[in-house]
Amino acid sequence: MRNVRRVAVGATPSGFMGSRRKAALGAPVLNLMCGTALVAGLTFCVQDAWAQDWVPELQAATGETHGRNDPIVIILPDDLDPAVYPRLAVELDDIDVTAFAVTAPGQLTLNPPEALSTGEHVVRLVERGEDGSIVERGAWFLEVRHSELIRDLSVRADLAGEVNARVLDGGIDTPPQHVTAESGGNLEAAAGDENWRVSLQGNYLYNSQLELGLNERNIDLGEYRLDGDYENEDFFAGLTAGNHDTGIESLIMSGFNRRGVSVRAGTADERISATGFMLRTESIVGTRHVLGISHDEDRIEGGSISVRPIEALKDNILLTGIYYNGEGSDGGFGIGTDEVINDGDGWSVAADTLWFDEALRVRGEFAEATFDFDGKDTGFAPETANAYSVLASLEPLRGSTLGGSTFNWTFGAQREQVDTFFQSLANPSLQADRETTSVFTDFFWDEFAAQLRVDHQLSNVDDFDFLPTDRTVNAYFNGTYTPFVEPLEDGSLPWFGQPFFGLTASVTDIERVETSSDFPEDDADNQSRSLTLSTGSNYATWSWNLSHTLYTFEDQTGFSSDSINNTTGLSAYILIDDWLTLSPNVQYDVFEDRDLLKTSRTINAGLSADITVIPETLTASLNYNLNVRTGDGDTPDSSSFGGEVVWTLREPDANKLGVALAFNGFLQETRNDDFESLEDDVQYQAFTTLRLSLPVSY
């Protein structure tokens, strides 16, 4: 074991701003750092005879701050023996970077191979002894900043565009322009310091064909999001503008990603937090409504507050209240025109609790919503309805292991009731008029995973005579098994590879418990069942996957035909060589109408190939698809062939434009011998393309 001697460092390193650290690391910090790549695992001993006591210093930054690309200069004593220089090594963030250091009389200059990230870095200088021992001469914290005001600054963008020239076509309607262009890109920018951060995300779309452009414009903004956050030891605050989801999840507001503005604030320990929002009701993109909240008739506003009332149980009990009101035209009952404006409001209160080391979760929520279905200030009065949800889940063996592997098992129950006329502008996808009781369990252990859920649902919650009452029972199961396979002595897999197995099954039973007074003859009694079996295996250079799905539908009322559907699919991925990969697939489908005694069969087959002619320069991709239908209700067969050849003139790299030329096209043939069709049997197109791409990074 080599010996290491640690020399006391008494120098004062420079290069830190304001009240940043101004001294070399003392003994406690050095003890913390000693587990690095150069020092870890080595023992300490008394001072070696070859080692001299000398102290280096870190040179101050030449400007106001130490920039990302600035060299790191370590000042060496003037009287240091030049024979020591070859024995010096530099470490940056636990990585030996001596190869990038240059020594000169009185100093050592490190030029990092790439720009340093902003933030705090650790620089360490060590001296190697002839006997293999190591002396740590100095260690410093170095803060890298963009400027005195901004510590972190980054800009990233992925820009891509292409110009297409149609050189060949037939049997298909084509636009008059033979040369078209399109482009798209994503942008991310961020700036911040220790307590604050501002970030921007956005994208754009361009199309030379006006009719295909976003909002009938050649170029326009897609979606964007602007965030600003501040946090200190006592509180946090933030603002978001653009397309975003406030993160509020409740019966009256869920998954509501819209354009608008929201603010948030709370205590640093998150015992109290609040969110206020003003969002557009409909989803929009583009620059026509930049903030999205300019129209009163298409906007909701409100807020939420969350409290952890008991300090001793602040991680266990969370109380949340939400309120909103507004107007919009997507109420969810087929109302989607500008002429009909629905208004509504709603509120909810919820309690979410965790017990027994978070093994038991109990959550309850009650909500009330008012909604004017036939339009604001017209027709009938608004409807007010309620909804509630109760959830309990238990993970009895939380954190346990079985056979040396993590074992997770969760089971629970949920009760949810949503009144017949419950409707929220901020949660338009919520299914109303249902009373649902569910039980579920999730299981994961080593090679096994399974999920099981059973739902019992009743409709016509408010017992209206003019509505029927239906009972729906749904059961769902999904399970996977991936056994561990020990590689052979040569590192390869056995003949059966790395197999995997899966099973998915579902059953849905719908029964009409009580008919409506308006349509007493209408009945409902049907069952649908689905079973999917899948298996496959992975090898070093290829893989395969086989699946079969059986679906049956039975209608006891005779309103719909009983049917059976069998679908079998087989696919593979084969790496023939470094220059060729093949992806074949075939699917066989049989559909039987048991009432009409008709059967139809469909075969879909395909083959894709990726070819590398010259690595990173010339590539090609080809694909062939065949669709054959037989039996009752026979329809035309079709086949298609497509492909592309790409010649890369210059690979895209950070802040460097990538250029490529491509030739692509397709040919489709439809066999219409027994059918009359307005379209040609053979359709084809071919293009030459110039592609440009530019990844930007700063």
What are these regions (language model features)?
Residues 1-26:
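N-terminal secretory signal peptides that target proteins for export/translocation
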Residues 49-68:
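Short, compositionally biased P/S/T/A/G/V-rich stretches that sit at domain boundaries
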Residues 80-88:
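Solvent-exposed loop/turn segments flanking beta-strands in beta-repeat/beta-sandwich domains
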Residues 103-110:
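Aromatic sugar-binding surface patches on proteins
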Residues 113-120:
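Surface-exposed, short loops/turns at beta-strand junctions within beta-sandwich domains
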Residues 120, 126-129, 136-538, 543-555, ...:
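Outer-membrane beta-barrel channel domains
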Residues 682-698:
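Outer-membrane beta-barrel "beta-signal"
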